[in-house]
């Protein structure tokens, strides 16, 4: 019996895979629990269309990430912070501050996607790595200046 998996099943296959199983396993376990559907002609067409739409959506997300990375690459960002006599800032520059500064420039980036190479606790130039997509990462150079 052929079934189409609705989710990943260890040892059997991944979501939307067409797999051959014994009739008892398919009818008594996989289908009643919602792990799979019977592989009819119409179900195969629906799954093929879903896969096509998912691929199109993933491609669009990647294109958007590339466009955003091009905007960020040529950007000069300044972050204002209170600085003491020794040049150290009070506290540290956070990903939220970087995200807010990018938003003021018209670029929306989730703060969770911004990572620093160490703590940013002094004035001067620094870099942050922004993970826009699993295949698109961009390095942002920013300057911390005294308020």
UniProtKB/Swiss-Prot annotation:
Which residues are the signal sequence here? none
GO biological process assignments: translation
Keywords of the record, alphabetical order, are:
Ribonucleoprotein, Ribosomal protein, RNA-binding, rRNA-binding
Respond yes or no to whether keyword rRNA-binding is given for this record. Answer: yes
Q: Name one GO cellular component term.
A: ribonucleoprotein complex
- Entry keyword Ribosomal protein: yes
Q: Which InterPro entries match?
A: Ribosomal_bL9, Ribosomal_bL9/RNase_H1_N, Ribosomal_bL9_bac/chp, Ribosomal_bL9_C, Ribosomal_bL9_C_sf, Ribosomal_bL9_N, Ribosomal_bL9_N_sf
**GO MF annotations for this entry?**
rRNA binding; structural constituent of ribosome
Could you tell me the superkingdom of the organism this chain comes from? Bacteria
Matching NCBIfam families, A to Z?
A: L9
Family matches, as HAMAP family: Ribosomal_bL9
Name the protein family: Belongs to the bacterial ribosomal protein bL9 family.
- PANTHER family in the cross-refs: 50S RIBOSOMAL PROTEIN L9
What function is annotated for this protein? Binds to the 23S rRNA.
Question: What's the protein here called?
Answer: Large ribosomal subunit protein bL9
Source organism? Cytophaga hutchinsonii (strain ATCC 33406 / DSM 1761 / CIP 103989 / NBRC 15051 / NCIMB 9469 / D465)
Q: Which lineage do the record's taxonomy fields give for this organism?
A: Bacteria, Pseudomonadati, Bacteroidota, Cytophagia, Cytophagales
